[in-house]
Structures are given as structure tokens and as C-alpha cells.
């Protein structure tokens, strides 16, 4: 069985950095295989041959069962150390500007801001999260730019 998540051309404030990450979903991440609304984050290389983009890689299984990958850098902040993290609700939230990105179906659109008890919840980011190609074949989920 082969699943491919395609990436269309778009302009991003996140620079192009090398991306190469292979995850064995049978031996290393067995609970991630065939799951829904689960996330893995990689802020550091696992192996010497890995490349994790500009700010790290967020790998996500969508509500539709698809595999998706995003750069963890917030496109509004555009700095490698200001990251988004999954919140368990099909969203990723920027640690700094608090913009919420909808990752539930692999798009990464900004939808608002997490600001409890504050009136302004307008998203600061006007770009989607930078997406990477996620290809699943056999037991291996491959992430590439």
C-alpha cells in the first residue's frame, strides 16, 4: 500500500532547507501507523543522515488517516527557534505569536490565535505552515522537501 501527500508550489517565509527523514512505523513508531489525529515532532536529528528542515518536522496523521508533514517554524515569526507544537485537536499552535494552524487534513492554514480571556483572536500569520511530502510505503514513512 502506498500513500502520498503532495505538496503544491507556494511561497513561504520559511527558507528551503534539506529535508530527509525516514520513520519505520512498524518497529520504531508502531502506535503511529494506522492512527488518526496523532503527531510526532522532530526538533533534532534521529540519525546522522537525517535532515529536519528549518525548524524541525511535525509529522501528523490527519482525521482522514493521511500522513502529513510540516516545518515546525511559524511562518509569521520565520525563525528556526520559534516553533509550532500540536495541541491534540488537529491543530498546531505557535509558541510565540499563538497563531493556531489547522493541520487536521494536512493543509496547515492559520485559523486564529490562542489567547484565553483576551478579545483579539485574529491569526497573525497569513501563510500556511510549510508542507513537506510524506510518502508511506511498506513500513517506512518518508518525509522529503
Which sequence ranges carry the predicted segments?
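N-terminal pre-ligand scaffold of iron-sulfur
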Residues: 7-87, 102-106, 130-145
